[in-house]
Amino acid sequence: MNILVTGANGQLGNEMRVLAKDSSDKYIFTDVNQLKGQETTYLDITDLDSIRAMVKEFNVNAIVNCAAWTNVDGAEDPEKYELVEKLNATAPENLAKAMKEVDGLLVHISTDYVFGAEPYNTPCKENQTGTPTGVYGLTKLQGEQRIIATGCNHVIIRTAWLYSEFGKNFCKTMMNLTATKSELKVVFDQTGTPTYALDLAMAIIVILKDFADSVISTERQRVEKSSYPKSGIYHYSNEGVCSWFDFTKMIAEYNGTTACNVQPCYSSDFPSPVKRPSYSVLDKSKIKSVFGVEVPYWTDSLKKCINNLKSI
């Protein structure tokens, strides 16, 4: 199978690169920026014609869309709205149209921010609705809706609190801060679950294999083409629940930087243009039952990531 990955130089895209090394599938990694030491093909996903040309050139069967505008507060800048909307809503629609035309699959990464800041107290299910409180959440929700409207084969995965060995993220920031500061304040009134990008990438590999086995193999047998029956919205994060404060304490423990005095504080101590979800735990029952995806506990994955970072 030929798989095109967008946003290949980000956290998830880089984890897909790691897994692709042991895959028999052909991967085409794309981004708008070049990363030193990485083979990256230029692709502007806001340009539908460019996507179509690349899909045709490489005979693409599936696209994994890891690209997005992810700066939540920065998205509130009125001068940035057009770009945010293009990246988070128009681009996913373009990718969906391209896959619709070749009966391919679009795996699209979305976010817990589509639920807004609703005061939930139980894990959010895929069919729950919310009201996004900022431009980021709103445009990500629009992206989901536009993908579905094309009628393409799609798996939309909402995730949260992503971290990895790559790029800038909360885990790496707190590893540095707990190592260099004597005291640190971290919010305790926002609850969710961290997601190790490598675990999410492994789940995506499972989904791609399922698509290849159930749809592409059917087409090769010259049976009438059928849509992918598992198309839909899914949730993925690691197992367990914690606050940002809990997350930081565990980072310090695994990093060996517990000398830093980490103190809990309220979200109001760090004013932001966008209200963060107070409870954004995602229910993962669907992705586990439909695809048989294994979901590691968040502390186990965190320890693995930090050990990898310390060995670099």
Language-model regions: role of each:
Residues 33-47:
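Rossmann-fold cofactor-recognition segment
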Residues 3-22:
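N-terminal Rossmann NAD(P)H-binding glycine-rich loop of SDR-like oxidoreductase domains
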Residues 203, 210-271:
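Mid/C-terminal beta-alpha module of Rossmann-like enzyme folds, strongest
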Residues 45-87:
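NAD(P)H-binding glycine-rich loop region in Rossmannoid oxidoreductase-like domains
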Residues 6, 30, 63-67, 106-111, ...:
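SDR active-site strand-loop-helix element
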